Amino acid sequence: MGHYHRLTHIEFRHPAEERINGKSFGMSMQLHLRDMQGRLAAVSVLLVPSGSENPFIQQIWNHIPLVRNEPVAPPDVMLNIADALPKDQAYYTYMGSLTTPPCTEGVTWYVLKNPVAVSAEQIGIFARLYPNNSRPLQASSSRLIKESRGAMPASPSGGQGFAPAPAQ
C-alpha cells in the first residue's frame, strides 16, 4: 500500500525559480507536501501570462495579504488543487532543497513541464506586492534530473494520493 503526501502550504515565486531548457518563467506556484514519515516534496507549477484570469489563482488572490510578510488566515473556501494543475502533468524530478532559509536539503521536487495560464494582471498584482521574491538560480551540483514519461503519480511518492493538511 502506498502512502499520502499532505499539502502543508502553497507559495508563489516571482519570477519562477526554475528554468526549462534555458527558458525562464514569470511566476510559479509551489505546492509543499509532507508524507507520514516527514519526508518533504514540492510540486512547482509554472505560470505564464495569458489573456484570461485563472479562477483558482483568483480565489487565492482574493485573500492575499496586502502587506508583505503579514500573516493571513486561510480563506474559508474549498480549493481543489486539481484545478491548479495542467491537464498534461508530465514533469521533471530531482532531489533538491527548500528555497527559503534554512534551505533544508532532501526535498523531492516535481516541476511540471506544462505551464498554467494566468492573466498578466494576476501576475502583476503579485509582482507589485512581492517583487523578486525568488531564490536565484542554483547550480545543478551534479544533481540527476529525471524526466517523466507521463503524468504525475496520484501521490508524488507513487502512493495513493494527496490529502489535506490536518487542522492545526
Task: Please place each PLM-identified region on the residue numbering.
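Extracellular or lumenal secretory-pathway regions
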Residues: M1-G26, Q30-Q168
